[in-house]
Amino acid sequence: MNFTLVGSFILSLLLGISDWKHAEFFKKSAAQIREGVPAYRTVWSSGIGGWHWYALQNGMKPYYLDSSVLKEGDVMVLPKGLSQYRISSDLEVTLLAKLWQKTGPLSFFSGNHFLGLYHNNFGNPPWTLSRNSTDTIYVLGYLGKRSDNK
């Protein structure tokens, strides 16, 4: 067999597994977060793509910077690195939890920055090699609007 063909197959397999592990982290985290919050609390989530889909499947509402109206006690979920990963600067929040993807040989080929394997540009390849955790999800409690007196 041709070395190039075998190498391409192995690389494709490793990237596919890494992408699957990335999606699995989002899927499990969305369910875990929703299960950990009382049903009477609204959970808001920012982000796009697979994370957005899993968040909606678990009853989270999409958070929009300029139009979402939060109540004290609501929970916000922000997956780091996705577009829309920001909140209004006038919100007072507290960190409730921080989740991150466990690393291992199957996550070494990381296709999970911004849009991962679905987006690239010159100098920014669609995947990287990394032994560090590349996914972090912040769970925040909403305390109310910031006042100028604080």
Predicted regions and their residues:
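Catalytic lumenal/periplasmic loop and adjoining terminal transmembrane helix
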Residues: 2-132
